[in-house]
């Protein structure tokens, strides 16, 4: 195995171990007495793989959120383990550990692009520390320990995947990940704008002068964003409708 590949594997394993060490106690916890009872324990609509369950997942904004992919993940937990909280917490924890690895890969790609000819070892070390900070930061507790917030870690996984594929110029794969991220939770709506920022720096596909974006050279870069912005607009409308239907939007 090449040295660089071996380094990536070792860092990834270290991040997974650190994540489980930091959040492992959650595996002994029950459901959180916030929304878990209403969303999972008392909600029978998501349980099963029949047409009625899929229709409900695809059309509901239960609790104000449109999240069919998150509902499907709960359904799979229920089908294999019933309402055993261990399985639900373990799924959240595994997703967060995967996100830590994805964060490392994204950070490594960004540092490499920004640093130019910098030493690969330094790039990997910087990316590893950034990912470790993300993995064990206390702000991650809510998304990992609260089963209802599965949508955060699930959406985050595909969001980071979309970023990674975009940095590798794999636009179709990035679009697919973005779509899945929005199906888990609409919090990633602004990702197309992030892509534009990355196109300015460090990708340098667009000029910092916005007026130059209309040039022939920049046009393909902008056109490839159209499907992303269409998805953002559609899911943005759906998210607002769900929040309004749940009474979460109130006038100032």
Where are these regions (language model features)?
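Polytopic membrane enzymes that build or remodel cell-surface glycoconjugates and lipids
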Residues: 1-252
